[in-house]
Design a protein with these regions (language model features):
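N-terminal alpha-helical segment
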Residues: 7-8, 27, 46, 64
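Glycine-rich hexapeptide-repeat left-handed beta-helix
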Residues: 37-119
């Protein structure tokens, strides 16, 4: 299950198991796979092309995954970039919508403001 604000910017094969819980503002690029196994994934996940998330794991908020990486263990900290096979923390990184530019950041903040006003 995905939260709101899912972005799939390119056409291509994307496989996601149905027992996973994935937060808001997730971005999935072409040729990515998030296998089944009840993963718990926070908000603002960014999965680059060719990456795989496998095993029963947990990922924190604002996790970016580099191209062709294999994530097979939990990373509970947020604001990180994972790369490699198996993946490891490459560096600290803000949420993708902050890193990618002002228009993305403004859109996310506008949605959150609207959501708060409706509650």
């Amino acid at each position: 299950m995905f939260g709101y604000g899912l972005v799939i910017p390119h056409w291509g094969t994307i496989v996601v198991g149905d027992s996973n819980r994935i937060g808001n503002y997730c971005v999935l690029h072409t040729s990515t796979c998030i296998t089944d196994n009840k993963k718990e994934i926070g908000d603002a996940l960014y999965v680059s092309a060719g990456s795989i998330i496998t095993s029963k794991i947990t990922l924190g908020n604002n996790v970016s995954i580099g191209a062709k990486s294999l994530v097979n263990k939990s990373f509970n900290n947020g604001n990180i970039l994972l790369t490699g096979s198996p993946a490891s923390i490459k560096k600290q990184r803000p949420a993708w919508y902050i890193e990618e530019g002002k228009s993305h950041k403004e859109r996310v903040f506008a949605i959150e403001k609207l959501k708060a006003s409706l509650q």
